[in-house]
């Protein structure tokens, strides 16, 4: 969390105010924000956003993910479930945890988000890296722009097509 705390100045990050250890457990204290779940925000906007609305929300997120990876930290769970919107319309990223929770076949119970988890997260022999992050980011952006969550990564390995209506395709950048 100390490395994540170094990125407090990035608009998409929820500020970490303190980090401490007690009873062999690390804790972090975050700033209090009134947040709306991103999935609810999408529902209130007919299930999808236009590119002109989504772009300013997602650009700070891609910058933050790049900054995290430059410091050796991955989130590996970018999905509508880990995103929030502030009262003033800014996107916030939540859900940081150990990388072992973002992969099947590790000693910890995995926390994967169907449609946004990359294929390598289902196979313990693969390493998670920036490509894993890009998969989750683009799957979340696809969902945001089309209103449809991509198929689970295992299903997409069998059939990688992303079906969408002609009207949806015409709206995409």
Residues of each region from the PLM?
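Conserved short submotifs of the Hanks-type protein kinase catalytic core
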Residues: 23-37
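C-terminal lobe helix-coil module of Hanks-type protein kinase domains
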Residues: 115-173
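AlphaC helix of the eukaryotic protein kinase fold
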Residues: 1-6
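Conserved protein kinase catalytic/activation segment
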Residues: 82-95
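AlphaC helix of the protein kinase catalytic domain
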Residues: 38-49
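Protein kinase catalytic-loop region centered on the HRD/HxD motif
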Residues: 61-73
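Activation segment signature within eukaryotic-like protein kinase domains
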Residues: 57-58
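Activation-segment/catalytic-loop signature of the eukaryotic protein kinase fold
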Residues: 19
């Amino acid at each position: 969390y100390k490395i994540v705390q170094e990125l407090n100045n990035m608009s998409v990050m929820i500020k970490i105010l303190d980090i401490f250890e007690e009873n062999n457990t690390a804790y972090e204290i975050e700033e209090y924000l009134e947040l709306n779940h991103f999935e609810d925000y999408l529902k209130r906007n007919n299930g999808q956003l236009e590119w002109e609305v989504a772009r300013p929300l997602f650009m700070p997120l891609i910058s933050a993910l790049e900054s995290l990876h430059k410091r050796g930290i991955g989130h590996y769970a970018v999905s509508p479930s880990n995103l929030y919107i502030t009262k003033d319309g800014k996107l916030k990223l939540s859900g940081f945890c150990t990388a072992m929770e973002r992969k099947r076949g590790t000693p910890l119970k995995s926390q994967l988000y169907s449609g946004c988890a990359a294929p390598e997260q289902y196979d313990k022999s693969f390493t998670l890296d920036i490509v894993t992050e890009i998969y989750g980011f683009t799957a979340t952006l696809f969902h945001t722009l089309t209103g449809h969550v991509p198929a689970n990564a295992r299903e997409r390995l069998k059939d990688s097509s992303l079906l969408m209506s002609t009207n949806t395709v015409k709206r995409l950048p």
